[in-house]
């Protein structure tokens, strides 16, 4: 009997152990289930709150409320751990842009300034977008002109006259395809003489100011958005925008441009205030330790921008301050040099296109600044520089400038001449592994220096339009650039309008073109889209 009880007891103990083990297994399974359910609930809750947070941020930006701080449910940890802002920004309107890219390029101009001895200048109709290729000439070879004398006008808008940048003799009228006019070249006088003006009265109306600017030849320095056209004098702009700093690769320091001329710049801003019922906005550089000299300007709304290129583009600033559009949302833009031109005209009664030009890029022996006038001959402008053999000269910056020869001329709106080596040398196994330092937004190619000797090599050829997020990494604008470009290619007007074509000009997409893995000519595509929209009225 006892022998029977012993195995029976063992059996009961085993059964109890198995039962306990199964209960513990069920309990463990329940814990896993409840844990997964709780995790799923937390993820769902986070998604809902994140979507609500994003909607709040988007709506606050549309309402113009998100000037400095992030108006959402969550704090912006990038701002929390970012470097401390300088004291001058504490009470200012500041836009911190987290997207963009500063190309690490050598050839930054040193702050030394010399007077360029240039004898030939030109005004080029192609510098003014929207102008008919064959404008009506008012001069011919051999004519003598003063600075400010009209040399041609647009047949479509005959009230807008384009003036000679210097006084001297017209020595050539260069024509291009289909008899289009490429350049009107002037041999400058040693002693410059400006056309005399009868300035409007201090209390002149807006209409009188507009007529004076049209007659003086200064009107073409005002550009209109959308499309970056020469401003239409029959349109009253909602606002006027001026960017006072340049973030393009090895670009000029515009603080040097106004050194000793702040009174002239202030006079120009005073004129702009009388041309719009809205506001004059100045985009200021908020990246430095000390405040911008433009902060002292009165009569204008000041907005600071911090971030990588293209933070200095006026189009990016318009997008964040008050986006432009057609009709009542038309705005005007000017550069610092153009504001100075207006200031000289109204303060001293002379047409003066004097500007500082940055001679920059790794191909120049001594990157620096030269003082000259608009349309200067590039060969004379860079005289004294040793140019690296097999280099490309660009009027403007490397992203949106135009290739020129030494016989070419500085663009009317350009304040920079860049030279970099041609990238026409084969790189051994370049398709497999970059053996030389190169600029790239990709983290797979580490950039170990801020002074890379960049060439024109694009490291690839045009290929199928690949969809990725490269554009979004460098575009600090709420615009779907890939979809916009594709809508332009297929000529979908409604999609082009809805996707933001009115807010962009070629310089705004130049950095995206640099980052494009498909090597698409985005600036050219955008300009084609502008042509289509203008043709459709």
Please give the residue ranges for each predicted region.
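N-terminal secretory/membrane targeting signals
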Residues: 1-23
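N-terminal, Lys/Arg-enriched amphipathic/low-complexity engagement segments
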Residues: 51-138, 305
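Short, solvent-exposed loop/turn positions at domain surfaces
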Residues: 133, 139, 156-159, 366
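Buried, small/hydrophobic-residue-enriched core segments of structured protein domains
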Residues: 23-70, 160, 174-537
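Short, well-structured beta-strand-loop connectors
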Residues: 139-153, 171-172
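Short coil-to-beta-strand transition motifs
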Residues: 159-167
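Exposed loop/turn and edge beta-strand positions of beta-sandwich/beta-sheet ligand-binding modules
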Residues: 133, 164, 180
């Amino acid at each position: 009997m006892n022998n029977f009880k012993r195995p029976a007891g063992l059996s009961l103990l085993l059964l109890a152990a198995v039962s306990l083990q199964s209960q513990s297994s069920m309990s463990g399974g329940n814990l896993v289930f409840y844990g997964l359910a709780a995790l799923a609930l937390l993820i769902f809750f986070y998604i809902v709150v994140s979507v609500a947070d994003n909607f709040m941020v988007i709506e606050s930006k549309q309402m113009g409320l998100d000037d400095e701080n992030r108006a959402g449910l969550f704090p912006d940890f990038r701002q929390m751990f970012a470097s401390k802002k300088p004291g001058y920004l504490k009470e200012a309107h500041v836009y911190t842009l987290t997207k963009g890219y500063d190309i690490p390029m050598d050839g930054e101009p040193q702050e030394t300034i010399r007077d360029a001895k240039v004898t030939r200048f030109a005004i080029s109709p192609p510098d003014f977008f929207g102008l008919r290729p064959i404008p009506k000439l008012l001069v011919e070879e051999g004519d003598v002109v003063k600075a400010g004398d009209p040399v041609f006008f647009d047949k479509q808008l005959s009230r807008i006259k384009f003036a000679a940048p210097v006084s001297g003799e017209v020595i050539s009228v260069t024509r291009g395809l289909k008899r289009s006019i490429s350049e009107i070249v002037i041999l400058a006088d040693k002693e410059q003489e400006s056309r005399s003006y009868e300035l409007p009265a201090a209390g002149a109306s807006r209409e009188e100011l507009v007529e004076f600017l049209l007659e003086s030849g200064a009107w073409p320095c005002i550009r209109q958005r959308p499309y970056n056209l020469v401003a239409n004098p029959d349109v009253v702009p909602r606002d006027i925008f001026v960017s006072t700093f340049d973030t393009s690769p090895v670009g000029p320091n515009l603080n040097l441009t106004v050194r000793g001329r702040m009174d002239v710049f202030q006079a120009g801003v005073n004129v702009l205030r009388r041309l719009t019922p809205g506001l004059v906005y100045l985009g200021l550089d908020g990246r430095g330790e000390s405040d911008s000299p433009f902060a002292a300007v009165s009569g204008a709304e000041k907005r600071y921008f911090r971030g990588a290129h293209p933070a200095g583009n006026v189009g990016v600033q318009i997008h964040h301050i008050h986006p432009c559009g057609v009709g009542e949302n038309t705005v005007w833009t000017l550069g610092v040099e153009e504001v100075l031109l207006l200031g000289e005209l109204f303060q001293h009664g002379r047409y003066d296109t004097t500007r500082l030009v940055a001679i920059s890029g790794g191909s120049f022996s001594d990157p620096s600044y030269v003082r000259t006038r608009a349309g200067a001959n590039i060969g004379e402008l860079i005289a004294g520089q040793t140019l690296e053999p097999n280099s490309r000269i660009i009027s403007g910056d490397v992203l949106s400038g135009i290739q020129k020869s030494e016989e070419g001329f500085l663009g009317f709106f350009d304040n920079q001449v860049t030279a970099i080596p041609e990238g026409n040398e084969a790189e051994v196994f370049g398709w497999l592994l970059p053996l030389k330092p190169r600029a790239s937004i990709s983290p797979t190619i580490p950039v170990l220096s801020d002074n890379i000797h960049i060439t024109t090599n694009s490291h690839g050829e045009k290929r199928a339009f690949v969809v990725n997020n490269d554009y979004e990494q460098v575009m600090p604008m709420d615009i779907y650039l890939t979809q916009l470009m594709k809508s332009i290619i297929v000529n979908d007007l409604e999609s082009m309008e809805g996707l933001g074509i009115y807010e962009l000009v070629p310089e705004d997409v130049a950095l995206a073109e640099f980052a494009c893995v498909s090597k698409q000519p985005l600036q050219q595509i955008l300009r084609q889209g502008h042509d289509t929209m203008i043709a459709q009225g």
